[in-house]
């Protein structure tokens, strides 16, 4: 069985973070492991508190994983401090990690910054160049490229600039301002659009975590990047189409929409 590792924060409500990652990886047929960067107290209406892991303990988690069950792919989500980013970069380099997918979580849905300036600098200098693919949304792509994105042409220019700057593939996720659910993958000097139909579901908590984890899962199984993106988009469409409705805010998706078997009912 292929394996995948998520390095991210814990979401106590189960809709995003490592909880969403583990569900996604399991649903996509790989064995999921996790290294936790932070504990959060949150639900569908917001985050009330964050308890950050120490660099030493994060390093211990990564050592424990890589020296026993080596991951076939690695997904990195929100990492809030430069010290933790340094630790991750050091360990991934030491263990020669492969198929690294970075979801550069930098901006909250409200538009507020989630990372301090030193953390942004560490992220861009140390983690992004290690990635096989980055998965920024529109606001994050604007930060990484230094460009304003208001249409498809702007999305193409920014995605191309990010790919050239960090030497990796970039999947820029539409949907924030343009293109409905169309995403743009840029790599090796060329761009490819992945078209998707917008699903009228207000419960979208954890969509970014889910997409990047699904891509990592398919890379772990040996799929090429284009196929991994196609399958990840199909999976997240299924999660949204299941129309799960939980909580008082923007609720979680149904990561196990396709789960069948004798243990499900009852």
Region locations from a protein language model:
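N-terminal basic/disordered segments at the start of proteins
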Residues: 14-30
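Phosphate-handling active-site elements
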Residues: 29-33, 192, 218-232
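Charged C-terminal helix
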Residues: 49-52, 226-266
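Conserved phosphate/ATP/ADP-binding segment of small-molecule kinases
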Residues: 117-191
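Conserved N-terminal subdomain of the carbohydrate kinase-like
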Residues: 3-6, 26-109
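Short, small-residue alpha-helix embedded
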Residues: 142-143, 201-225
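Short pre-catalytic strand/loop immediately N-terminal to key active-site residues, enriched for Gly-Thr
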Residues: 7-13, 191-205
């Amino acid at each position: 069985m292929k394996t995948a590792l998520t390095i991210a924060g814990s979401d106590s409500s189960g809709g995003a973070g490592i909880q969403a990652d583990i569900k996604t990886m399991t649903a996509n047929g790989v064995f999921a492991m996790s290294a936790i960067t932070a504990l959060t107290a949150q639900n569908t209406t917001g985050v009330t508190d964050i308890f950050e892991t120490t660099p030493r303990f994060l390093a211990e988690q990564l050592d424990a994983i890589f020296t026993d069950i080596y991951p076939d792919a690695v997904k990195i989500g929100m990492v809030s401090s430069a010290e933790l980013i340094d630790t991750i970069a050091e360990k991934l380099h030491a263990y020669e990690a492969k198929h690294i997918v970075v979801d550069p979580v930098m901006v909250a849905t409200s538009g507020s910054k989630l990372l301090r300036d030193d953390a942004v600098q560490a992220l861009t200098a140390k983690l992004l160049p290690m990635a096989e693919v980055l998965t920024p949304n529109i606001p994050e792509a604007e930060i990484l490229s230094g460009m304003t994105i208001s249409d498809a042409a702007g999305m193409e220019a920014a995605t191309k600039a990010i790919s050239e700057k960090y030497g990796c593939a970039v999947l820029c996720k539409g949907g924030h301002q343009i293109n409905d659910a169309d995403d743009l993958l840029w790599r090796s000097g060329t761009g490819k659009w992945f078209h998707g139909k917008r699903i009228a579901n207000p419960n979208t908590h954890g969509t970014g975590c889910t997409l990047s984890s699904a891509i990592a899962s398919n890379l772990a199984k040996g799929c090429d990047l284009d196929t991994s993106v196609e399958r990840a988009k199909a999976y997240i469409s299924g999660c949204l189409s299941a129309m799960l409705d939980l909580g008082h805010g923007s609720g979680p998706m149904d990561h196990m929409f396709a789960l069948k078997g004798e243990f499900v009912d009852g």
